[in-house]
Curated annotation (Swiss-Prot):
Pathway: Pyrimidine metabolism; UMP biosynthesis via de novo pathway; UMP from orotate: step 1/2. Belongs to the purine/pyrimidine phosphoribosyltransferase family. PyrE subfamily. One of its GO terms (biological process) is pyrimidine nucleobase biosynthetic process. The keyword Magnesium applies. This is Orotate phosphoribosyltransferase. It catalyses: orotidine 5'-phosphate + diphosphate = orotate + 5-phospho-alpha-D-ribose 1-diphosphate. It is an enzyme of class 2 (transferase). Its cofactor is Mg(2+). Signal peptide: none annotated. SUPFAM superfamilies: PRTase-like. Gene3D superfamilies: 3.40.50.2020. GO terms for molecular function: magnesium ion binding; orotate phosphoribosyltransferase activity. Homodimer.
Length: 192
């Protein structure tokens, strides 16, 4: 599966939106990849996550103990990817604004791959790495369905992206005029 295949799946699900969006990262964009529109279709989700699992297998030869997803956005892709890898899926969730591995205990040194839906700045992955290291995990890599940075983001561990697709985003104080004129919509899940 390549980048165009991923984009085609998003198009098939009518999941590429245009307007003025405030991303989960806080940055602004004229394009929003509404992964919920994809994830509501089990067949499309299965295709993406099977492709991601295959890419993870090609990239990581050593044993992986767990796949971990950051709640909320990473829950579905991490679970489905873990199913294709044949290993357990766990998640971190926010407690007082900070990710914690709340519902699970892992053995010290457990080899973990973080799976996320879409990466823009990589903040959720970096926060997930911190939570997992605090829980004793060895985070060997992270993975995502779509890297919006086009491969430029640094998440602190290797990032395996099923697709890299650079979508321009802006700081709130650097919006182009045509974007600033549109009302902003914030569809993300960071503060839920």
């Amino acid at each position: 599966m390549n980048t165009q295949d991923v984009i085609d799946i998003f198009k098939q699900a009518d999941a590429i939106l245009e307007g003025h969006f405030i991303l989960t990262s806080g940055r602004h964009s004229a394009i929003y990849m509404q992964k919920a529109q994809v994830f509501m279709h089990a067949d499309l989700t299965e295709k993406l996550c099977r492709g991601l699992a295959e890419k993870i297998k090609r990239s990581i030869k050593e044993k992986i103990d767990y796949v971990v997803g950051p709640a909320i956005g990473g829950l579905i892709p991490s679970y489905e990817t873990s199913r294709h890898l044949g290993i357990p899926s766990l998640w971190v969730e926010r407690v007082n604004g900070i990710f914690e591995l709340r519902r699970f205990k892992i053995k010290n040194g457990a080899r973990v791959v973080i799976v996320e839906d879409i990466v823009t700045t990589g903040l959720s992955i970096r926060e997930t790495v911190e939570a997992l290291v605090a829980a004793g995990a060895d985070v060997v890599a992270s993975a995502c369905i779509l890297d919006r940075s086009g491969g430029k983001v640094d998440v602190g561990v290797p990032l395996i992206a099923l697709a890299e697709y650079e979508i321009v985003s802006y700081a709130s104080d650097a919006l182009p005029t045509e974007l600033a004129l549109l009302p902003a919509v914030k569809p993300g899940s960071r503060n839920i």
